[in-house]
């Protein structure tokens, strides 16, 4: 396996182009944390892929499924499916951790503060090869990312 390090690569100061994508991603994560928390009694008993699929069916409408919380599709129109699934995984992982910490706290002597569910997380989207970026379109030193720019992906 070939490992690539980017310590010696100078990045241009163009991070502002990432801000709209990051802002949308973080708002979507907050929405999902809040929504999934209200449905945790049903979601918490599921595991793995069935948990993710159920969570996605709650927020995303398809031709075969009417979402219970259709506001997600209205607030985040045209959100790419890989980002939506990443948002769902991050939100579910955050809630799983919170409820695990809460259970541990309840089973302990409760000498520390009760865990608090954070709704606004500073999470960043992960750009996976073939899904969110393409190396084949450019030279060896470039990457083409799929970002939210000018109100479109």
Predicted regions and their residues:
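Nucleic-acid substrate recognition interfaces
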Residues: 1-153
